[in-house]
Amino acid sequence: MDIELRIKRFNPEADDAPHWETYALVAEPSDRVLDLLHQVKWYQDGTLTFRRSCAHGVCGSDAMLINGRNRLACEYLVRDAGTRISVEALKGVPMVKDLLVDMDGFMDKYRAVMPFLVSDSVPDDGKERRQSPAERQRYDDTSKCILCAACTTACPVFWTNPDYVGPAAIVNAHRFIMDSRDEAHEERLEIMADADGVWRCRTVFNCVEACPRGINVTRAIFEVTAEIERQRG
């Protein structure tokens, strides 16, 4: 297949503003968009900058805006993308260079929700904290998050309010709020009940469409909201 790949480029050392550059490529229908980016970097322009790691949809490193939607470049097939493909950096986060964005703010919000198991008490049998299949199911969906930022950077509330904690942080808070073994339930709900927490969600559902892991992000936000209301009585 002959492919026309348009990439929004930006070099802070040379450019005043981002601009589009077009590359002619030949690819197989089964190739991924990441393969096209590799072609450009390896054979046409070694200055092209982007982030990637596992190339198997597990690490979340190569999330970017492809044909107008947030996707993982390593998962999106050329046959689905078409012969004219546009690629640009994620929205709402600072652009470092080309397709590379600054994830520090995103990760700060993630860390702020205490995304780890807090369980200081001694288990009943002194060995393990048992959990039934039903208890595990409560957070099964949100445990799939790979921190690609596709959901958060697809959110129009996040675009206009950088203080909003964002869908990804709420998803990871949900994962531990719903965990029967965790003992920081109230602390996380207090964080989520902040003015820039769950109440900022406007149920646009962009986050659900963007998630490459199929997480129902909006439902997770609703469930955290319900927990806050239940706690308040």
Where are these regions (language model features)?
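Eukaryote-biased recognition of intrinsically disordered, low-complexity regulatory segments
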Residues: 1-22
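Short, contiguous acidic and Ser/Thr-rich linear segments
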Residues: 20-32
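Short strand-turn-strand beta-turns centered on an Asx-Gly dipeptide
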Residues: 26, 65-68
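Ferredoxin-type iron-sulfur electron-transfer modules in oxidoreductases and energy-metabolism complexes
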Residues: 30-43, 88-233
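Active-site phosphate-binding and catalytic loops of NTP-dependent enzymes
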Residues: 45-51
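DNA-contacting interfaces and partner/effector-binding or oligomerization modules
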Residues: 51, 61-66
